[in-house]
């Protein structure tokens, strides 16, 4: 028996490194990250006990849409949260601008949902070839700050977002950027979408939402 599981980059400890590798420490700050790490540990235990083969994909921040009819309804994520604020006539919020980053806002690695889906398919094909128990990061390998994201969103949407800074949220790491060297080497996977393409597709789906 084999399967591919989606975990999350939220399992990682806060890091000053330019890119986080799969072997880096996992001490999540948030309850969400803790539950994802527990899931991964349980998968590993089942694999040992039941001869269960798996690949876990630690995905970073998913953005965009592969179909105009399917947008992101998770209002906890940055991009749809900004969309919701603008549509409601409110100013989008930046949670803290005093982090040890280039502009004081959190830095994250964003990946298009279509690229994530393709990584999943590549992982499943690898499982079909034989016994594999691996963990892979799935991201773009590039980090963007909240302010940089909002600048691109402003361009894609054609509006001035005029964000307001509010206090930090508990559990937010200053920086999370994926090292994707392992998945590139082992599976031959690389992301294709640019940040502009991610946000353009997300905005198109948001406008097309019924």
Please state what every model-predicted region is.
Residues 11-61, 67-77:
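Catalytic helix-loop patch of NAD(P)-dependent Rossmann-fold dehydrogenases
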Residues 78-79, 112:
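C-terminal catalytic core of Y-nucleophile DNA break-rejoin enzymes
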Residues 7-9:
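Conserved NAD(P)H cofactor-binding loop of Rossmann-fold oxidoreductase domains
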Residues 86-210:
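C-terminal substrate-binding subdomain of Rossmann-fold SDR/epimerase-dehydratase oxidoreductases
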Residues 46, 80-88:
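Short amphipathic alpha-helices and their capping/turn segments at secondary-structure boundaries
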Residues 62-63, 99:
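Hydrophobic pocket-lining residues within nucleotide cofactor-binding pockets
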Residues 1-5, 53-55, 135:
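Conserved catalytic-site loops of classical short-chain dehydrogenases/reductases
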């Amino acid at each position: 028996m084999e399967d591919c599981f989606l975990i999350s980059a939220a399992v990682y400890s806060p890091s000053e490194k330019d890119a986080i590798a799969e072997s880096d420490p996992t001490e999540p700050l948030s309850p969400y990250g803790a539950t994802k790490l527990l899931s991964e540990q349980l998968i590993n235990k089942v694999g040992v006990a039941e001869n269960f083969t798996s690949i876990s994909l630690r995905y970073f921040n998913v953005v965009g849409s592969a179909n105009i009819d399917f947008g992101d309804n998770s209002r906890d994520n940055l991009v749809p949260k900004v969309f919701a604020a603008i549509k409601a006539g409110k100013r989008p919020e930046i949670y803290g601008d005093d982090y040890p980053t280039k502009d004081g806002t959190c830095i994250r690695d964003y990946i298009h949902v279509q690229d994530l889906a393709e990584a999943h398919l590549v992982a499943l094909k690898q499982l079909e070839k034989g016994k594999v128990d691996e963990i892979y990061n799935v991201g773009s390998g590039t980090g963007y700050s909240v302010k940089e994201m909002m600048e691109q969103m402003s361009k894609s949407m054609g509006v001035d977002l005029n964000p307001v800074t509010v206090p930090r949220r508990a559990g937010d790491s200053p920086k999370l950027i994926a090292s994707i060297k392992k998945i590139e080497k082992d599976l031959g996977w690389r992301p294709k979408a640019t940040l502009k393409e991610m946000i353009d597709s997300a905005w198109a789906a948001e406008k097309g939402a019924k």
